[in-house]
Amino acid sequence: FNQFVATMDLMLEYNFAKADPLGADYDQGALELACGNVAFWPNGCWAWPNLVEGGADVNGEFGFISFVLGDDTSDFANNMIQASASKQIMVDKVQSTAEQQAAAKEFINYLVYDANGQKMFVEETALIPAAKNNPNAPLDPLGKDIAERTAAGLLYTSCFIAPSDHWSVIGAAMQKYISGNSSKADLASAL
């Protein structure tokens, strides 16, 4: 907890949106990085299209760094990057009709088994497929960086399973802290 808060405090101190961190605009973050006004933008490989739209040099050097937590250089979190499935596709069997479920399954099969769907998934969405049968390699520097780190064993995964009120409860506590309306002790108590 202490290491996480120290890292968050550092990011808040040296941030283009320091004056209003809760008002930071996603598109502005992409522009700031693409134009070279900031060195870091915490995000994932899916942000590549946003960077290109913001004017990033498609041949530029972009990649990921560890999300540093503390001063222990031997800590895996300080030497690797965290990567896990950020997008999940699910079929609703409660509120959707049988026809809608069939269409959803057909779409998933298109993404997983169809050559055009596989290619689109990787090249147009800038995502890295979980399905091992997809032969397409990332074309953008962010996807390439993750693929290289995966091959080198330099990433760790996290399984994000949280209670249904996670965002409303923990998110609210984090927003209070980030906006300067609570202390570190208040944040710890809320979490």
Describe the role of every protein-language-model region.
Residues 14, 54-126:
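Extracytoplasmic/periplasmic substrate-recognition and gating elements
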Residues 26, 43-48, 67, 85-87:
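Beta->alpha turn/N-cap motifs
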Residues 28-31, 48-54:
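Pocket-flanking alpha-helical
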Residues 65, 121-176:
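Long, aromatic- and glycine/proline-rich binding clefts that accommodate carbohydrate-like moieties
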Residues 176-190:
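Short, charged, surface-exposed loops that flank catalytic or proteolytic processing sites
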